């Protein structure tokens, strides 16, 4: 693996080259979520508060028992909010704005393959899911990939 030391405001770290990077090297760990009923205004405030460009939209998966487990069934991006805001409707729910189903990638997937999938699906964001647990572990954006392209060795 070819690595390059990159200086940042917070110190330095090793950046993999684009040809050797995986989704885990570029993704943002953790995800910001909203309920399917959240309004455009509420989703916009969540994005602004957390300085993110997308949120995962949750719905409740109701099983046969008393327990309920939230599942991610879509992604709303900042461009979705702008588009909906221009057409009016600040009270529209996130469920109406979400891209469904979300593009899902694994952390070990080569970054080039993830980028190809994102381009093919027209998805600026992909949900990163750990296959062993089927749990979301992060979000990958096109800007995350650009960061590797910009700072990793060619």
Segment roles from a protein language model:
Residues 1-154:
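Tandem CBS (Cystathionine beta-synthase) repeat/Bateman regulatory domains
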């Amino acid at each position: 693996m070819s690595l390059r030391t990159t200086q940042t405001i917070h110190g330095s770290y090793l950046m993999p080259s684009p040809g050797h990077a995986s989704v885990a090297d570029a993704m943002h760990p953790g995800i910001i979520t909203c309920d399917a009923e959240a309004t455009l205004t509420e989703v916009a405030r969540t994005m602004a508060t957390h300085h993110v460009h997308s949120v995962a939209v949750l719905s409740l998966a109701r099983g046969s028992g008393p327990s309920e487990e939230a599942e991610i069934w879509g992604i709303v991006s900042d461009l979705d909010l702008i588009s909906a805001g221009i057409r009016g409707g600040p009270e529209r729910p996130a469920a109406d704005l979400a891209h469904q189903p979300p593009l899902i990638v694994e952390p070990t997937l080569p970054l080039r393959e993830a980028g190809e999938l994102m381009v093919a699906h027209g998805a600026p964001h992909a949900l990163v899911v750990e296959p062993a647990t089927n749990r979301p572990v992060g979000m990958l954006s096109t800007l995350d990939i650009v960061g590797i392209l910009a700072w990793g060795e060619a």
